[in-house]
UniProtKB/Swiss-Prot annotation:
Its main location: cytoplasm. This is Ribosomal RNA small subunit methyltransferase G. Specifically methylates the N7 position of guanine in position 527 of 16S rRNA. HAMAP family: 16SrRNA_methyltr_G (MF_00074). Its EC number is 2.1.1.170. It catalyses: guanosine(527) in 16S rRNA + S-adenosyl-L-methionine = N(7)-methylguanosine(527) in 16S rRNA + S-adenosyl-L-homocysteine. One of its GO terms (molecular function) is rRNA (guanine-N7-)-methyltransferase activity.
Amino acid sequence: MIFKDYDFLQNYDLKNFEEKIKIYKELLSKFNRIHNLTHLKNIDENIFDSIKILDFYDFSKAKNIADIGSGAGFPAVFLAFLLQNNFHLFEPNPKKAAFLRTLKIECELSNLHIYKEKVQEYQNIFKADIITSRALMDVKPLLEICKNLKDENTVFILWKGSEIYQELENIKDYEIFENNLRKYCILK
């Protein structure tokens, strides 16, 4: 994928980004053979899906971003490749958390923090400015399990599919941006 062709990425260090993607793909291939971390076929499409939110939302004022159910790193790892914000990834699966820790070391990501625990069991040291999650669960249960990390200023950015409209019933303050079948939901 040629990232330099996208206007919304023009202000980022794309050479460094592409080097980190190469490391990511090599590590994912290695870990996937043993641990079966993901069944995704087109990694490039999923990387683009992870960073497309930068076309719709400005992350510059956020100090701490929490990603819930980080799995193989989509979307938070790729945002951390591009941004300087602190990313806190919550992944209770030991194999996936080990992959994320290895990736952090290999890519020298000082802005990435991995927690091998469920977010609802986390005893808060910080409040997240932004909480992200990609297709983990319905919106209302997600809001509930994140109560230790959020305050009245926390913004949720969710990568969802077409079901998002039903999930948002009785929720008022949100925006949805679309890219193909993906719905990027921003809850304020």
